C-alpha cells in the first residue's frame, strides 16, 4: 500500500511549445526583417548589418536547452531579392527526456532571386535524450541557400557518453515541390551502426552542410574535395546532386571533436559562399566569442 505522501511516479515538468515566424523582404537594395511572430521562449534579436545590405539575425532560445516534451517550430521566409544570414548564439542542448520526445522543426522558404545562409551552432545530445531534429528547405529556381547542422552525441566537455536515448534526423530539400534530397534516419544509442565502419565508425560528432544554387556544379565539388580532410579522427566528403531546376552540393563530416568538425564546416562555407551566392565569405562575429 502506497503512502499518500510518496507518489509512485516522478513528477514531470511542463513542456514548452514554442514557435517563431520570420519573413525577410527587400527594401531597395537592403534586406529587412519585415515580419516576426513568436510564441513561447523563441525570439530574434534586432537585425544587424555587418555586410552592408545583408540582414543578419540571431535566433534566441532563453531556456538554452530542449527537454522531453518540448517542441520548437521555426519558419523563415526569404522573399525575392533578399539575403538573410541566420545564426544562433550557442549550442542547442537536448536534455534527458524522462521518457518523452523533444523536437525541433525548421522550415526554410527561399524565393527566386533570394539568398539564405542558415548557420546554427551544434546540437548536443545528452545521455537519455530522445531528440527529433527536422529541417525542410523549399527553394525556387534562381534562389540559393547554404545551411548546416551538426550533432554531438554526449557531452564531450564533461566526459559524458551517450549510452541511452534515440536521435531522429529528417532533412528535406525541395525545388518547386520536387525533391532534391530527402534523408530520414533513426539512431539508437545502442545501435551497432555507431561503431561500424559503414556507420559512424566510433565517431561522436556528425555534420552535414548543403549548398543549393546554380553555382553548385560538379567542378565546384571536385575543387572543394581537395581541401576536405580524410584521417582516422576526422573525415569529410562532398557529393553533387542535380535536377533540371536546381543543383546542390552535400558535404558530410565525421569527427571525434566538435571543434575540428566546426572548422571543416566553416572552411567549406567560406569556399562555397561566393560561387553559390555571389558574395564573399565573412566569418560571423558570433564565431569569435
Swiss-Prot record:
**What is the annotated localization of this protein?**
Cytoplasm
Q: What InterPro entries does UniProt report for this protein, alphabetically?
A: UreD
Q: Does the keyword Cytoplasm apply?
A: yes
Main location class:
cytoplasm
Question: One MF term from GO for this chain?
Answer: nickel cation binding
Write down any Gene Ontology CC term.
cytoplasm
Please give one Pfam family short name: UreD
Give yes or no: UniProt keyword S-adenosyl-L-methionine.
no
Keyword terms: Chaperone, Cytoplasm, Nickel insertion
List the HAMAP family hit by this protein, alphabetically. Answer: UreD
Q: Which PANTHER family match?
A: UREASE ACCESSORY PROTEIN D
Q: Which family does it belong to?
A: Belongs to the UreD family.
User: Quaternary state and partners of this protein?
Assistant: UreD, UreF and UreG form a complex that acts as a GTP-hydrolysis-dependent molecular chaperone, activating the urease apoprotein by helping to assemble the nickel containing metallocenter of UreC. The UreE protein probably delivers the nickel.
Q: What does this protein do?
A: Required for maturation of urease via the functional incorporation of the urease nickel metallocenter.
What is the protein's given name? Urease accessory protein UreD
Query: What broad taxonomic lineage does this protein's source fall under?
Result: Bacteria, Pseudomonadati, Pseudomonadota, Betaproteobacteria, Burkholderiales
Which gene holds the coding sequence for this protein? Answer: ureD
Amino acid at each position: 500500500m502506497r503512502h499518500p505522501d510518496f507518489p509512485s511516479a516522478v513528477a514531470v515538468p511542463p513542456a514548452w511549445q514554442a514557435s517563431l515566424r520570420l519573413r525577410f523582404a527587400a527594401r531597395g537594395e537592403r534586406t529587412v526583417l519585415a515580419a516576426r511572430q513568436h510564441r513561447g521562449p523563441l525570439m530574434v534579436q534586432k537585425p544587424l548589418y555587418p555586410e552592408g545590405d545583408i540582414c543578419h539575425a540571431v535566433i534566441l532560445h532563453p531556456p538554452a536547452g530542449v527537454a522531453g516534451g518540448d517542441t520548437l517550430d521555426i519558419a523563415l521566409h526569404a522573399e525575392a531579392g533578399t539575403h538573410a544570414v541566420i545564426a544562433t548564439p550557442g549550442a542547442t542542448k537536448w536534455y534527458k527526456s524522462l521518457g518523452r520526445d523533444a523536437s525541433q522543426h525548421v522550415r526554410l522558404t527561399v524565393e527566386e532571386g533570394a539568398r539564405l545562409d542558415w548557420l546554427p551552432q551544434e546540437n548536443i545530445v545528452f545521455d537519455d535524450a530522445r531528440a527529433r531534429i527536422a529541417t525542410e528547405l523549399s527553394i525556387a529556381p534562381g534562389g540559393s541557400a547554404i545551411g548546416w547542422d551538426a550533432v554531438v552525441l554526449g557531452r564531450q566537455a564533461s566526459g559524458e557518453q551517450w549510452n541511452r536515448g534515440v536521435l531522429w534526423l529528417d532533412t528535406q530539400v525541395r525545388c518547386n515541390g520536387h525533391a532534391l534530397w530527402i534523408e530520414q534516419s533513426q539512431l539508437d544509442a545502442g545501435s551497432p551502426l555507431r561503431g561500424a565502419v559503414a556507420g559512424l565508425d566510433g565517431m561522436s560528432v556528425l555534420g552535414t552542410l548543403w549548398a543549393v544554387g546554380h553555382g553548385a556544379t560538379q567542378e565546384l565539388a571536385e575543387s572543394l574535395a581537395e581541401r576536405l580532410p580524410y584521417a582516422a579522427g576526422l573525415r569529410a566528403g562532398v557529393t553533387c546532386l542535380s535536377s533540371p531546376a536546381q543543383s546542390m552540393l552535400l558535404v558530410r563530416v565525421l569527427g571525434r571533436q566538435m571543434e575540428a568538425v566546426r572548422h571543416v564546416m566553416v572552411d567549406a562555407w567560406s569556399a562555397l559562399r561566393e560561387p553559390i551566392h555571389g558574395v564573399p565569405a565573412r566569418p560571423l562575429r558570433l564565431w569569435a566569442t
